[in-house]
């Protein structure tokens, strides 16, 4: 058996799929834990909204830089090595944030988290694509579902510690960060043992470097659109329900809960849909569901109908990202993934701020028409996506 065949067999194994699933879950748990800690961190350090925005911007800029470096290194030396090297940055970032007593230290923690998350995001998607190719059946939606589950667990740890330890406000930041860091360290130890080697992806022909394919920029445009649409659902759904339905903030949280739940559900089902209908069709219908959902929340004001609208949004946007990232990885490995993920990440990072400006201009109800239009654009662009289903079983 050749070395290439041996590597393919290792990537096709159940243990390889478990390893990548754990990567996504660990990354989601750290990001969810950090996001869940922000209100408490604000109380602990006495931060205002501008300082929070600065910290998040620094972390986001670090992530975008790490994506470019991590994507190229993943192709050059293997996505396994980059993924495992990124986790310590996440751990260090969580500990730094947890122990921070001044704003400057919190920024350092945010930058460490950004560096780790950016490199890991590209690399774990790259090795996920290789596992999918080796198994010859879709599995990327499943991986992304466990990122969402990990994020939910990380954010839910805030409530768990509050109940078990009776901690509130700034007092919860340090134990939360240390607990998340320990969980990530345990995950890293397991990943070191079970993660198989990933293939090296060359980008030269006869010694000449090949250009980034044109399709990468089309996928990047789609990532911009779904990044803003998904970011809006994550950051604005609860506020939208609260303001439009005229309910209290606790009830308004149904918006985000509904979006998150339906994203997980569709991602657990998504691979079966890809096997049956193909990625282009799944992306089209995902964008259609999301567009109808956003149109619904733009037109209605009753609580039940708003929940239905946000359910459609979650159901729709949950289909799109795993498929776009999978296509990017199949056509160009980590280098193309770095381009596409950067577009999506930038939109996810900056989109909610843009929506905030729009809300101030036209109101939160009518502002939701913008992501509806972007989702309509994804429907049009889906027909230009490269077909990568040929090597996957159609069942």
PLM feature segments, named:
Residues 36-50, 235-251:
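Short amphipathic helix-loop junctions that connect adjacent transmembrane helices
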Residues 46, 78, 99-104, 246, ...:
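Helix-breaking motifs and short loop linkers at transmembrane-helix boundaries and internal kinks
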Residues 66-78, 162, 266-279, 359-360:
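Helix-to-loop junctions at the C-terminal end of transmembrane segments
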Residues 80-83, 283:
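Primarily marks hydrophobic transmembrane alpha-helices of the MFS/SLC 12-helix fold
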Residues 119-134, 318-331:
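Intracellular juxtamembrane helix-capping segments at the cytosolic ends
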Residues 172-190, 366-384:
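Symmetry-related core transmembrane helices of the 12-TM Major Facilitator Superfamily/SLC fold
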Residues 277-324:
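C-terminal transmembrane helical hairpin of 12-TM major facilitator-type secondary transporters
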Residues 331-366, 371:
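A late C-terminal transmembrane helix in Major Facilitator Superfamily
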């Amino acid at each position: 058996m050749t070395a290439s065949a041996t590597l393919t067999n290792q990537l096709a194994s159940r243990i390889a799929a478990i390893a990548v699933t754990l990567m996504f879950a660990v990354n989601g748990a750290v990001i969810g834990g950090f996001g869940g800690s922000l209100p408490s961190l604000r109380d602990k350090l006495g931060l205002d909204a501008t300082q929070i925005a600065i910290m998040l911007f620094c972390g986001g800029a670090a992530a975008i830089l790490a994506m470019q470096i991590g994507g190229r290194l993943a192709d050059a030396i293997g996505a396994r090595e980059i993924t495992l090297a990124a986790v310590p940055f996440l751990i260090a970032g969580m500990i730094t944030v947890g122990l921070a007593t001044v704003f400057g230290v919190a920024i350092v923690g945010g930058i460490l988290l950004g560096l780790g998350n950016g490199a890991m995001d590209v690399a774990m998607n790259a090795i996920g694509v290789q596992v999918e190719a080796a198994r010859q059946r879709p599995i990327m939606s499943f991986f992304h579902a466990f990122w969402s589950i990990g994020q939910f667990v990380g954010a839910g740890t805030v409530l768990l510690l509050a109940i078990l330890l009776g901690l509130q406000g700034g007092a919860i930041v340090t134990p939360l960060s240390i607990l998340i860091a320990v969980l990530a360290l345990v995950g890293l130890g397991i990943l070191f043992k079970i993660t198989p080697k990933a293939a090296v992806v060359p980008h030269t022909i006869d010694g000449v470097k090949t250009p980034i394919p044109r399709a990468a920029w089309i996928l990047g445009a789609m990532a911009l659109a779904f990044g803003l649409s998904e970011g809006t659902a994550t950051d604005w759904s609860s506020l939208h329900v609260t303001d439009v339905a005229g309910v209290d903030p606790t009830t308004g949280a149904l918006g985000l809960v509904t979006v998150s739940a339906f994203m997980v559900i569709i991602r657990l089902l998504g691979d079966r849909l890809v096997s049956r209908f193909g990625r282009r069709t799944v992306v089209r219908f995902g964008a259609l569901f999301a567009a109808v959902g956003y149109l619904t929340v733009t037109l209605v004001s009753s609580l039940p109908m708003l929940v239905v609208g946000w359910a459609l949004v979650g159901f729709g946007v949950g289909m799109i990202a795993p498929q776009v990232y999978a296509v990017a990885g199949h056509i160009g490995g980590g280098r193309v993934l770095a381009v596409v993920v950067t577009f999506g990440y930038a939109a996810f990072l900056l989109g909610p701020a843009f929506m905030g400006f729009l809300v101030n201009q036209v109101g939160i109800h009518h502002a939701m028409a913008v992501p509806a239009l972007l989702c309509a654009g994804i429907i049009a662009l889906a027909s230009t996506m490269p077909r990568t289903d040929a090597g996957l079983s159609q069942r």
